[in-house]
Amino acid sequence: MTVTVWKYPKRDEWKVIMARPQMDLISLSRTVSDILESVRCEGDDALRRYEKQFDRVVLDALQVTPAEMEEGVAAVPESLKKAIRQAIDNIRKFHASQAIEVKKVETSPGVWCWQKPVGIEKVGLYVPGGTAPLFSTVLMLAVPARLAGCHEIVMCTPPGKEGKIAPAILYAARETGVDRIFKLGGVQAIGAMAFGTESVPQVYKIFGPGNRYVMAAKQQVSVQGVAIDMPAGPSEVMIVADSGADVRFLAADFLSQAEHGADSQSILLTTDRRIADLFPAEIERQLDRLPRREWVEKSLSHSSVVLLEREADLADFVNAYAPEHLIVHRADAEEWASAIVNAGSVFLGYYTPESAGDYASGTNHTLPTGGYAKSYSGVNLDSFTRKITFQQISSEGLKNLGPVIEEMAEAERLEAHKEAVTVRLQSIHS
């Protein structure tokens, strides 16, 4: 498999290099909307029908039972349980540090304002199964949801052919405090959480990655009264390397991203010709050892190495692309990264692989893709909260601020707004 190498491209060629694999959500729209409408109208009957059609499983009960939970938990090796608990601890520490103390501010004498974060009452988590059951996604979503104070955490994940959920997903859900787990995948799972059925409760916000059908479903329900975490597309990584970078590390990071899916994208940026020349051969060497080679090769078909002429161009290229993941293989990684303003999550130094953030460093792996890192943050504690503002004004405060409000209301010709202040001021002065 040959990775495309761009040598000293001009700036007007950057757009071509940065082109991402596109999901044609428009062509999926009718199929997705039909499934969503069926779930809205038919409830559990539609869910069972689509599970039989798409996941090839006949389900009596949609919700995971206590007995199924215990059976699944017992099947998880102790070594994996220990690793999951350590990851939970790190994720909890990092997200707990994001909590903000409520602070009252006196904006003018007698006028107090403050803001209070409140957990979203009902949230839905979508955890992909398919080619790789992503139990790590349970940790990334359920830990901050519980920290934020969400009252009900509902999770949907597709069952295997025997109608069972992957044991590691069940263990992760139990350890993070997920309230209810449903054996549902795809568009039908998103519809169930968005609209509610006889078995599945309706939620207020849906989180989690998925294939293009899941992404299209999330976008459709987001204009029907249900919030979603962010728009999302294929996963991606950009790697920046200096002359001191180890080409083995670079190739390993490049391939770990390609392993996410056939439409994932990896881009290596460097100004060092030796790195650019050695890299393709190292990719081939490591690729031969991967069991998912055929899957990874599809991703590599739209990945590339970019050899730039000037150091100053590196940060410009990164900020223009706005990668989901940015790995900085540089001796001056932290200093260099101070110029980065568009990225989902940044991994600094030679010994910080992206997989650390995917699993256990503590940061969240649910991140904006497709250039959305220019305008969206990754999932964090705030993602699971709403901020309610409060204000309280004393009689003296209204004396001070009232004339300002009256003047502005009169200028906007909103007499009732002005009168709401005037009647109070008259009461104070009488």
Where are these regions (language model features)?
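Conserved NAD(P)+-binding/catalytic subdomain of aldehyde/semialdehyde dehydrogenases
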Residues: 175-265
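Short acidic-hydrophobic, aromatic-tinged amphipathic segments that line or gate anion-handling sites
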Residues: 2-9, 180-185, 305-310
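N-terminal Rossmann-like NAD(P)+-binding subdomain of aldehyde/semialdehyde dehydrogenases
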Residues: 1-121
